[in-house]
Amino acid sequence: MKKTIIVAALFAAAFTTNAQAPKLPAGTKFKVVTESNNITSMSMMGQDIELSNGNKLYQNFELKSVSGSSYQLSTSITRIAGSVSAMGNEQSFDSEDASLKSNPMMAEQLKVLNKQIDYTIENNKVVNTASATGSDLLNTLLTQSNGTSDQAKYFLTLPAASIKASHQWSVVDNKPGAATESLFVIAEVTPTDISVNVLTNAKITSTLNQNGMEIKQNTQGTIKLKRIYDAKTGMLKSETGTGGLKGTMNVMGQDAPIDLKVTTKSSVVPM
């Protein structure tokens, strides 16, 4: 109880910082590789099950336009690789393996490949998301990210006067299926890097259709992230994160309690 009160007080003490435009011009392109490892513990029909899921996601990004404190960022996933382990069985996959295209078990993961998604970002928050392929793609990405993906993270757009150690601000983002409340604190500033610690409380409600089965997930928890930005350009260089989510997963009408542990690591490379 005491910990909850302290965390709530920290969020209340923080404030929203007015953002500025990214320092880099429209047309800037970069690649992001994100590795994530999820361990899910669940109990269903009297049986305890542990599922280990590791993913490596390759994405291309482009800063499409900049207007004041608002900018548009487009992205597409070019490759997915990883492994799934459950009940003594392990399966590895790589979207570059041509044989996977005929595997119905991978249909949900592969449908996100090479589909452009456009994000409009204002004051450090995504205010609009659009995809020509519709909401199914966006729902799939939401489920796979477990609330750890923040598309507003790639550019640090604070006023120059705010770039100093201990400066903090908060962002509340309530969207259908995902509600997050994040506290940002600048941990260190050097001539080359700006280190930012992020504490995010997330609540995820999503529905995923996999192999003809409807899977509903209701989870909430906390994610801790460390981001390193280039001090000159304000572009993200790397991110690491750990966290946990708890809740229920509904499969075939049956609720099962789940406990999800998440670790992530991202690296950004200019193109």
Task: Locate predicted features.
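Bacterial Sec-dependent N-terminal signal peptides
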Residues: 1-25
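Signature of exported/secreted
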Residues: 20-271
